[in-house]
């Protein structure tokens, strides 16, 4: 009996795993812990091999403490499906961030922009809500010289 249950779960996971290799376009919202900023962005899942996908994304970090940011990421996910409609994934990739800060000095507003490249590392959890919708939560750490940053985000994607 145990063997039949195991085979059923394995085949359900295999059938659903094919659904993980579809393109997806979505929106996300997140929080950057070190700078206490809220983010919003768009992402795309582009599969290139079984359970592998490239994930480009663009995020805007809203101003907090007179600091805002644009971020472009290129990550790779390896999906590990389980229980039919769920998967976990490690992620790794690159980041480009452009931070802008404003300050007032002698009644003049000064602004400073810093552009940095970095490396992303993290993990995520994804759930297929329906045939065309998925939901994910993801945590990553961005290694950038003098500006390392922890980030958590949630996203909703449309699969096509």
Residue ranges, per PLM feature:
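Bacterial N-terminal signal peptides
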Residues: 2-10
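A generic hydrophobic-segment detector
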Residues: 115-160
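Extracellular loop and loop/strand-boundary signature of outer-membrane beta-barrel proteins
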Residues: 28-29, 60-63, 106-111, 140-142
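Short glycine/proline- and aromatic-enriched beta-strand/turn motifs that initiate or cap beta-hairpins
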Residues: 13-61, 159
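Residues that define the transmembrane beta-barrel architecture of outer-membrane proteins
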Residues: 21-23, 36-40, 68-72, 86, ...
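Hydrophobic alpha-helical segments
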Residues: 5, 14, 53, 89-90, ...
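Gram-negative (and chloroplast) outer-membrane scaffold detector with strong preference
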Residues: 45-107, 116, 127-133, 157-160
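Glycine-centered flexibility sites
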Residues: 26, 30, 41, 93-95, ...
